């Protein structure tokens, strides 16, 4: 007869959760940011709004984005004029697209991660799927299980409508699953498609235009597990996680799903709120490790927009190279909501290895991953790099 304590001990992994593989994917349609304002105002039949177009051009110029990838192309938009209006009933048209395309793009990223991991997919015990693009039952987690041919007994977690902080949320959840279930291998997938948020311009809601200038499509997948086998290659350890709602930030970022699709509202000084509270989050995370110099750690921050990164840098006195991987992803892909931080994780380990920097985290041992989004919610993940 075994005790409950013995059962519990047998269930737990010994070491910390570890990221073992990363895969990313985008739709084939690539959009150049410099020509996007002309295209956007033409496709939405808004060319008469000349002043607004100039404002939008300035937004795109200041965005620090070179290009983005979008499932929505000219052909699809011409077939779905309701999606091009600012406020037309269009949810059915949007749902028809994303319910199919979100799991499909997720599959592409997951297939790359599984290939890098090098283990049979039958060893995947848990699946976390995260998207802010569309809602369905059974969900995108079920569709991906079918698309990949995972075991029917895989334990699934579906996270809908979390928003831009959720790249941190999925790692927090994956850590808890991996460390509390011996031998667990968690497939994490974030897949985002802007077909649910795309809409024409209006001069009454400029915050809607900000989203049109920043958002792009992408999917990222990671495999997380504890106690790596000799055949598995650890990339980063997930050491500590936290989630918090910032004080006095209610209504700072809102998203509402309705007949017109998903509408976003930025109501307060988001960069200011984040930069004002970032140090508190870092102290809580790094004081136990005796780290107070935030230039001595590597950085992965959700690139909500350039102003957030600029103000965080200024507040903490960060060297420009600290945000290099983050700014690279913003420049090459735009803001892909929950998938962004996983793209940055991928970029960082690739560049670190290419440049012979000694660890997956730019030659440094410790790092931080931040997610920022609706709430205002902040996710903090303390990472430990792996020697390469």
From Swiss-Prot:
Gene Ontology terms: biological process: flavonoid biosynthetic process; polyketide biosynthetic process
PROSITE patterns referenced in this protein's UniProt entry, alphabetically: CHALCONE_SYNTH
Paired cysteines (S-S): none
Acyltransferase is among the record's keywords: yes
Sample GO molecular function, one term: naringenin-chalcone synthase activity
Record keywords: Acyltransferase, Flavonoid biosynthesis, Transferase
Active site: 164
Taxonomy, superkingdom: Eukaryota
Pfam families in UniProt: Chal_sti_synt_C, Chal_sti_synt_N
Function: The primary product of this enzyme is 4,2',4',6'-tetrahydroxychalcone (also termed naringenin-chalcone or chalcone) which can under specific conditions spontaneously isomerize into naringenin.
Family under the similarity heading: Belongs to the thiolase-like superfamily. Chalcone/stilbene synthases family.
Protein name per its UniProtKB record: Chalcone synthase 3
Organism: Glycine max
């Amino acid at each position: 007869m075994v005790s409950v304590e013995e059962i519990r001990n047998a269930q737990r992994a010994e070491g910390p959760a570890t990221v073992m593989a990363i895969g990313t994917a985008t739709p084939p349609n690539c959009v150049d940011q410099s020509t996007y304002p002309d295209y956007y105002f033409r496709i939405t039949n808004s060319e008469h709004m000349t002043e607004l177009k100039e404002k939008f051009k300035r937004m795109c110029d200041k965005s620090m984005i070179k290009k983005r990838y979008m499932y929505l192309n000219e052909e699809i938009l011409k077939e779905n004029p309701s999606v091009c209006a600012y406020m037309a009933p269009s949810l059915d048209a949007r749902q028809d697209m994303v319910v199919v395309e979100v799991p499909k793009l997720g599959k592409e990223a997951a297939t790359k991660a599984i290939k890098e991991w090098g283990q049979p997919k039958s060893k995947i015990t848990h699946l976390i799927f995260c998207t802010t693009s569309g809602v369905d039952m059974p969900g995108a987690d079920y569709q991906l299980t079918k698309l990949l041919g995972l075991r029917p007994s895989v334990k699934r977690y579906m996270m809908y409508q979390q928003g831009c902080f959720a790249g941190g949320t999925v790692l927090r959840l994956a850590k808890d699953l991996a460390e509390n279930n011996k031998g667990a291998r968690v497939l994490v997938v974030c897949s985002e498609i802007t077909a649910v948020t795309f809409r024409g311009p209006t001069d009454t809601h400029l915050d809607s235009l900000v989203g049109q200038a920043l958002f792009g499509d992408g999917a990222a997948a990671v495999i997380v597990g504890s106690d790596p086998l000799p055949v598995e290659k650890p990339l980063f350890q997930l050491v500590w996680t936290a989630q918090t709602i910032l004080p006095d930030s209610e209504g700072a970022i809102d998203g509402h799903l309705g007949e017109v699709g998903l509408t976003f509202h930025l109501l307060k000084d988001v960069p200011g709120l984040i930069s004002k509270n970032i140090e508190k989050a870092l102290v809580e995370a790094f004081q136990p490790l005796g780290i107070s110099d935030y230039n001595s750690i590597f950085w992965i921050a959700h690139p909500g927009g350039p102003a957030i990164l600029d103000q965080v840098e200024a507040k903490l006195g960060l060297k420009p190279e600290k945000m290099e991987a983050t700014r690279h992803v913003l420049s090459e892909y735009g803001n892909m909501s929950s998938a962004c931080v996983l793209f940055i994780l991928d970029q960082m380990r690739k560049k670190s290895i290419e440049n012979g920097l000694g660890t997956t985290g730019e030659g440094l041992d410790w790092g931080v991953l931040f997610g920022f989004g609706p709430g205002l919610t902040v996710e903090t993940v303390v990472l430990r790099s792996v020697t390469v």
